[in-house]
Amino acid sequence: TQIRSGKHRASIEFFADRVPKTVQKIRSLLPATVPLCHAKFVGDELMFMIPAVIDPEYLKSSIETGDVLYYPIQQTICLFFGDTIVPFGRGPFNAVGRIVDGSADLRQLAKTIVHQGFQWARFTQSDASAEKTPAPLSERTAEIIAERQTIWQTAPLELENLKSLQKGRAGNAAVRVYAFADAYRNQRNLWLLRDGVKHENITVETAKLLLAPMLREMADRCDIWALSTPGRLFRKAAGPPAEVTNSEELVDLLDELLIYNNRWWLWLDSCIPWFDLDVQLQNGF
């Protein structure tokens, strides 16, 4: 399996014996164009999102150079290519593979991406015979998937409007950061609910009671930042949960909400000049 961006490439060996369900799911998505980002808090790590929520299969207590991890909460594959590794959070970590070639290329890419926000990369698998997972037939999940596919490679129109939106004396910088923080909070809350349903710590009926007001709150916050499309989608999704009758349907819905929200979160992340802001702080702002 390879990840390519421009002239740079890296080869990944996935642990098919340790994480068979993960590998099967990933292969069903390939080939794919993915946003390759720098994990700013961690150090020598690049990561990219895939449109799939996959439960952990193989956990390890620490991270080493060359590790490839999958982070279910934000549907990201994480590539640890260098010696500076500061895990953002405690283990155990969901290990899915190893970098077998191309660490130097990833190091060069990281120097550009850390200031640029992200770069597009091509994620491919030499085995073209992998079966494709059929798309969910639910009308609710189908609409969310369609919206996610629309913004997967094309920046949402609302993102440009956000870059000039002003809120009082705080100006535009605060608008971008607050919108980003809202999306991050949404992701954590959706994941906690999904995790509770998946492991039967929360009943389906209780989860539905929690999800509806959660989605309406998410929609209201989107309206504040003039993000009309996700606001409309979240508000519409707040109605149907009462029709969900079992945990599988609810997890499917939550998975698609997680993927869609996280794609928005990454777009919002890309429009914040994190390192320019940091320079100002270091200069005594």
Where are these predicted regions, by residue range?
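N-terminal intrinsically disordered, low-complexity, charge/repeat-rich segments that act as generic
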Residues: 1-8
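Glycine-rich active-site loops that engage anionic ligands at enzyme catalytic sites
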Residues: 14-285
